[in-house]
Amino acid sequence: MSASSSDPFHSFAKTSFTSKAAKRATAHSLPPLPGPGDLPPGMNVEYDVAIVGSGPIGCTYARELVEAGFNVAMFEIGEIDSGLKIGSHKKNTVEYQKNIDKFVNVIQGQLMPVSVPVNTMVVDTLSPASWQASTFFVRNGANPEQDPLRNLSGQAVTRVVGGMSTHWTCATPRFEKLQRPLLVKNDSKADDAEWDRLYKKAESYFKTGTTQFAESIRHNLVLKKLQEEYKGVRDFQQIPLAATRQSPTFVEWSSAHTVFDLENRPNKDAPKQRFNLFPAVACTNVRRDNANSEIVGLDVRDLHGGKSITIKAKVYILTAGAVHNAQLLAASGFGQLGRPDPAKPLPSLLPYLGTHITEQTLVFCQTVMSTELINSVTADMTIVGKPGHPDYSVTYTPGNPNNKHPDWWNEKVKKHMMDHQEDPLPIPFEDPEPQVTTLFQATHPWHTQIHRDAFSYGAVQQSIDSRLIVDWRFFGRTEPKEENKLWFSDKITDAYNLRQPTFDFRFPGGREAEDMMTDMCVMSAKIGGFLPGSYPQFMEPGLVLHLGGTHRMGFDEKADKCCVDTDSRVFGFKNLFLGGCGNIPTAYAANPTLTAMSLAIKSCEYIKKNFEPSPNPVKHHN
């Protein structure tokens, strides 16, 4: 373990606490940020690959390139706060899996709003002795350049190691063809095959599956009812989820850690690999050469010690998210700073940076399961007597071909009804939640999540048993429009002293969002009545957190008005790559992470083909 006080585990190591957890912590102790004159043994300011951001996309690049022999450094503005598994999902604790509504507070605590208009409310009841402002306050992240009528008010970011994957839903559907960007021009079959190949690999990294909730009573109640109601019209299935069921009562949700464990290398498990993670480090500038054809350095600042240095690498990869990738590029001379002015000529470097941005519309409601559905749970049971009385019994006939439910279902119900005779519901307390979807299709061009999960909104009050609740979230697409922009101030900085992001966005008109709302209302009524306070509603713009198109992908920079090619390489620069949802140039309604990961895998294939890893000086002893 490093003796440097800048090591996040420094204070911890000085204590007398020597539990297994403490001993385990030493295995991934982090080196201090390397600077000239104080390099720890084996460290340098030069790497093969420098990655900005530690979410699933950054971890995809890290995994692919580290395993290919490259010496990789990863820089993350946030810190490690997800326990001993670096960048792991915070829902992987028994506490939150027993009470999902408690996890809402975790999400709310992690999210940081991107752009908040200045609060113009005046406090006119202050004491005359108190200092009073003559203009509006601009602290607490307020952005005086943000027009509240053109804001993505719900848009937020998560600044921790692992990014949003430390609290996401883990929904990883593939994009249907109408949502997908092209990777192969003029050959539909080849494009389909390429996407299938990339999706399969991405799904293996995330451990995506569709059977983790196959033995959930609530899941099957909702799924079977909707399949029955929409037979021959719509297809329903489990949401594709990046998760692994460990037991009937515990699911391990995937995250950045699942893709790549973020442990420094070499280590005993990977003695021939090279990787270092540097948390609490802000990347402030990517340095261009005089010819504007290559990146020659990455300026970073240690947020603890305040030291700034320049990192050298052969390849530079930005995976800090749709907002922060564009923010770093704008601060580095790409695109332009300041409010966009149509009268000015387009900038020479990445003229379409931050244009054509997209975000999904979101409608939401919650329903309480119908009496019909709850009564159907015990359809195969023979119930004698009253609960709490000596003669009370619940039985069924295993293997009876006339049973409406499988034996696993009936056994769970019988056991619960006998063990918990005080409970008016026949559904076991630890029955997994529903996770149902009807996927995007041309006739219904929206994505659906019919489930029970924690978001920054939608918690259930204590007076309602959450086993009865079903959440309905329908996500609509937005056509990319050049006038919908994300731009960065030339005057104001954010809390991290980086250029303040500002949105100039409005959802395009049309009937699609209203049709989606109608579809949700009709469908949800088949499951039950609305939960008071959670009636069907449109949610704040940006609350979906699926911002896309900030640095669009295409085949030709001018013709497609984009920033990167289909290998995610920035146009005009041979060694600068961008990863994440900001690359996706299409109107999409589904969760975009799996698609962004697939693009990162393709990008890694290009890097491995066009760059060589440096010789590995580490000596290995057998």
Curated annotation (Swiss-Prot):
pH profile: Optimum pH is 6. Active and stable from pH 3 to 9.
Signal sequence, renumbered to the chain: 1-28
Cofactor: FAD
Keywords associated with the record: FAD, Flavoprotein, Oxidoreductase, Periplasm, Signal
InterPro entries named in the record: FAD/NAD-bd_sf, GMC_OxRdtase_N, GMC_OxRtase_C, P2OX, P2Ox-like
Chief location category: periplasm
EC number: 1.1.3.10
Catalytic reaction equation(s): D-glucose + O2 = 2-dehydro-D-glucose + H2O2
Temperature dependence: Optimum temperature is 30-50 degrees Celsius. Active and thermostable for 30 minutes up to 55 degrees Celsius.
Cellular component per GO, a single term: periplasmic space
Cofactor details (free text): Binds 1 FAD covalently per subunit.
Positions of modified residues (Tele-8alpha-FAD histidine): H167
Compartment(s): Periplasm
Binding site for substrate: Q449, H451
GO molecular function per UniProt: flavin adenine dinucleotide binding; pyranose oxidase activity
Assembly notes: Homotetramer.
Biological role stated in the UniProt entry: Catalyzes the oxidation of various aldopyranoses and disaccharides on carbon-2 to the corresponding 2-keto sugars concomitant with the reduction of O(2) to H(2)O(2). Plays an important role in lignin degradation of wood rot fungi by supplying the essential cosubstrate H(2)O(2) for the ligninolytic peroxidases, lignin peroxidase and manganese-dependent peroxidase. The preferred substrate is D-glucose which is converted to 2-dehydro-D-glucose, an intermediate of a secondary metabolic pathway leading to the antibiotic cortalcerone.
NCBIfam families: pyranose_ox
Protein name (Swiss-Prot/TrEMBL): Pyranose 2-oxidase
Gene from which the chain derives: P2OX
